[in-house]
């Protein structure tokens, strides 16, 4: 399973100060996430409360916290997919299945991705 890491955050407030300076701390957190150094990545990404923060929490099996963060995010295919994974791990199979099917409805490519993910495959066995 491949996760896409975003170095920007969707839905940022319009009064954000624009700068050409890269957020090196955030970039370092994403780099650590890509290197699978999840605890170190979470230490950096924790204040951002974005999708990459959710991925770090899921990678450390902090599934309830991941669900809390996902509840604050706009619904899209990726957030629904991540909700499905968290639900699967929390034993909430039917809820996870609904989230996965919604992810597929929002983006048909998620169906292919789900077929490669054993946690999603487990949801679909029902």
Q: Predicted regions span which residues?
A:
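TPR/TPR-like alpha-solenoid helical repeat scaffolds
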Residues: 55-61, 88-89, 109-126
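Helix-start (N-cap) detector for alpha-helical repeat units in TPR-like alpha-solenoids
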Residues: 22, 77-81, 111-112
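Generic alpha-helical secondary structure signal
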Residues: 23, 27, 64, 94, ...
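TPR/TPR-like (Sel1-like) alpha-helical repeat modules
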Residues: 47-50, 74-75, 88-112
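Alpha-helical adaptor scaffolds
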Residues: 27-34, 39-89
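Long, contiguous interaction/recruitment modules in multidomain scaffold/adaptor proteins
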Residues: 1-30, 35-40
């Amino acid at each position: 399973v491949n996760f896409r890491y975003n170095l920007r955050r969707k839905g940022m407030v319009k009064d954000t100060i624009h700068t050409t300076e890269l957020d090196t701390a955030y970039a370092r957190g994403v780099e650590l996430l890509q290197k699978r150094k999840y605890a170190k990545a979470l230490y950096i990404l924790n204040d951002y409360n974005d999708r990459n923060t959710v991925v770090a929490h899921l990678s450390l099996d902090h599934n309830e916290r991941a669900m809390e963060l996902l509840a604050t995010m706009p619904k899209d295919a990726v957030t629904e997919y991540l909700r499905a994974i968290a639900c699967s791990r929390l034993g909430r199979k039917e809820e996870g299945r609904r989230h996965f099917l919604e992810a597929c409805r929002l983006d048909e490519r998620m169906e292919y991705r789900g077929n490669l993910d054993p946690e999603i495959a487990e949801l679909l066995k029902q």
